[in-house]
Every structure is written in C-alpha cells, then in structure tokens.
C-alpha cells in the first residue's frame, strides 16, 4: 500500500476545512495510508524585510526537513511548479508505485512560502493551480486531488 505524508506549516484552524480533510482521509483508506503532520509556523511581522522572511522560511524548512523519511518521493507544492492534469498526476503515482516507490511526501509551505533549500530537494515541484489559495485551504484541495488520483488509477467513477 502506498504511504503518503502531507507536511504542512501552521496549525489548521478552520473547522470546516478539518471536517473536509477528515472525510477525504476516510475515503482514501482503501487506497493509501495517509498521514498529515504540522510544524509550527514561525512568527513573521507584516511587511518584514526580505532577510527576516528568508530566516523565517529557513526555520520552517528545517522543521519540515526533520520529518522527511529517507527515500521518500518529495513533492513540493509551489506556484512556480509544474501543472499536471489529474490524469497525468494519477499516472505519475501509478508509475512510481510500479517502479517500487511507494512512499510519497507532499509539502505545503506557510503563508510566506518555502525556503529554496527545501524546494531544491523536491523530486517534483507541483502547482495545483495558477490561482493563489490560502495555505490551509490547499490542504483540502490536495486531499481531494489525492482521492481523485486514486479513483483514476483504479478506474472507478468520480473524476469525470
């Protein structure tokens, strides 16, 4: 069974998002073992100088990096990432599984993004959309997409 970890910066505060994520975790049970792990976001003053923002991003990246398992296929969500269709991403996951890579980690950065040191470690930079979303909403969007990918992989109705 495929193991998927979702690493996030910051605590999920909105109840409606938590309920949606919980629903997708339940739906994914037959397909993959999915766990979500949060690291605390670092305080960053509004309108902070670039150097301060870089320090904050690096501190968050260091916390995330400690949670990475050796050998995991690392997908970093990034606005500058590659845009793939749901079908293409499902195919990518299926290809990884067939080649023996059954451990995937997705990273969702905080409100000021991720440090380059972490982005550079990615096996895949993935953009879910050209639109900008709050990082907490991205968790729910990612969960829905992961569920959709597995429905596509198993040729089950849902994604049409």
From Swiss-Prot:
Location(s) in or outside the cell: Cytoplasm
Keywords: Cytoplasm, Methyltransferase, rRNA processing, S-adenosyl-L-methionine, Transferase
Cysteine pairings via disulfide bonds: none
CC per GO annotation: cytoplasm
Official protein name in the record: Ribosomal RNA large subunit methyltransferase H
Residue positions binding S-adenosyl-L-methionine: 77, 109, 128-133
Record bears the keyword Lyase: no
A Pfam family of this chain: SPOUT_MTase
Family: Belongs to the RNA methyltransferase RlmH family.
CDD domains assigned: RlmH-like (cd18081)
Reactions that this protein is recorded to catalyse: pseudouridine(1915) in 23S rRNA + S-adenosyl-L-methionine = N(3)-methylpseudouridine(1915) in 23S rRNA + S-adenosyl-L-homocysteine + H(+)
Domain of life of the organism encoding this protein: Bacteria
Subunit structure: Homodimer.
InterPro entries: Alpha/beta_knot_MTases (IPR029028), RlmH-like (IPR003742), tRNA_m1G_MTases_N (IPR029026)
Organism whose genome encodes this protein: Desulforamulus reducens (strain ATCC BAA-1160 / DSM 100696 / MI-1)
Example of a GO MF term: rRNA (pseudouridine-N3-)-methyltransferase activity
Enzyme Commission (EC) number: 2.1.1.177
Function: Specifically methylates the pseudouridine at position 1915 (m3Psi1915) in 23S rRNA.
Protein's gene: rlmH
Methyltransferase found in the keyword field: yes
